Amino acid sequence: MNFILSRGYYFLFLLVNILEDGIMVKQDDLVRMIQEIISATARAILNKKKIRQQDLDEYDLLTQQMLGFPVKELATMDVQELIDRYANEEDRIGKIELASVYLLRFSEEVEEDILLKSKLRQDGIRLLKYVQQEDTNFSIQRDCLIRMLETNQ
């Protein structure tokens, strides 16, 4: 796990564990496509292969379709606004969890603005905690990730 963290790819590790453990299992094609892309990307990272920008772009597009807005907007959204956005949706927990991981990914990509980096990371952790508290299924992987992120600040 330290290798993944040191490379800034813990968001992929989290998503693969979430998706493979069935926490976000859905029957629609969009989620299955996201699962395939995330799994392929995570395998590439773990095998020390370079991730193609085309794969990341495709993942971004699918995530945008799933969340219902451009993923870059996550950086400017308030955590409560995001939670409220999906309050009445059946798959709200999955969408909030996906958004939280994306915020963590963005925090790893930001280098020049330390305040933005910190905000994105904190928002991602807050959303993960919310998901852990509100989800009907307890996730050991999610709990470990939250603890690791809080310790690694």
Predicted regions and their residues:
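Short, Lys/Arg-enriched N-terminal segments with co-localized hydrophobic residues
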Residues: 3-23
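A conserved position within tetratricopeptide repeats
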Residues: 45, 63-67, 71, 107-111, ...
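N-terminal alpha-helical interaction modules that lie
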Residues: 16-96, 151-153
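Amphipathic alpha-helical binding modules
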Residues: 113-153
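"A position-specific structural signal for the A-helix of alpha-solenoid helical repeats
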Residues: 35, 98-105, 144-148
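Mid-chain, well-packed structural core segment of small domains
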Residues: 92-113
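Short coil/turn connectors between adjacent alpha-helices in alpha-solenoid helical repeat scaffolds
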Residues: 45-56, 107-119
